């Protein structure tokens, strides 16, 4: 198949469209609504949704500088679409008993215990990340607890990750 995009949509353009919701852009709005349902589903399954902004901490002239980078709606839907694709792909692989590298993660704590213990949202998510178990790869499907999914594969970045290329 040959894909010929009509125009390039930047993150900024997408954010503006998703904020204004013009009738001409119904497809993008429908995609956002679908992915919001995916997030809601994962939350009900115990997913940890990091709602705090991404922070970059740097040491500059013996001072610690903290830059907070707020997540935009377009970044959230791109991330969620990648997660959804990985989940749907894992279901397909499992259904047809295909060989694949499943990503599994077990949590070393109950997230609610940490999230309820601290008031500062930045601190709670930093501490929570320390208690989360590392994900690992196996050939058998299993739960990815922090994503709230019964199975998951990474498959959306074949140029950056060789396993994604194999799965594709």
What kind of feature is each model-predicted range?
Residues 1-168:
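Electropositive polyanion-binding surfaces
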